[in-house]
Amino acid sequence: KIREEIQVTLDEHFGGGDVSEFLRRVNEDPAFTFETEEAVLQYSTDALDAAKAAMPRAFGVLPKADVLVKPYPEFAESGSGEYHSSSEDGTRPGIFYIAVADPTGRSISNQLATLHHETFPGHHLQGAIALELGDQQHPLARYLWNSGYGEGWALYSERLADELGLYPTPLDRIGLYSDQI
């Protein structure tokens, strides 16, 4: 089914072709990669701003804590992206660390799927609210990570972001789909 969704997008917006070949191309062709480290960071920051603005349309409760996009420190710059949680009282923001090194080797296509998985409506939304609920929730639910629930929510959130219009280009949608293969 996911390959079929990719094929439809490929046929409608990229002139058709073989899915596997196109996915290889979007990861290697400079036309589908970033030019500078600053461009990687700006693209993700702009997308996060759009996601934050869309959340009230889908959720009645939002976390007090903000979430920021930051580049990985140099010693860890080979990662693809990860979320570090906010504080329980909401005063310290969550951080979404992204790799900006080697921008010409970094495909634009999957940036948004990763961002939505890790921030809004993904891990940050779910995790920050769980922390901020305090005693309204059992401590195990607040402090221990349940990977089945957390990753299930984050995968769902990638598709929810699509329903909210947060994948503005066909290439972004290809990235959403290809991350789910």
Question: Residue spans of the language-model regions?
Answer:
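N-terminal maturation segment of proteins
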Residues: 1-181
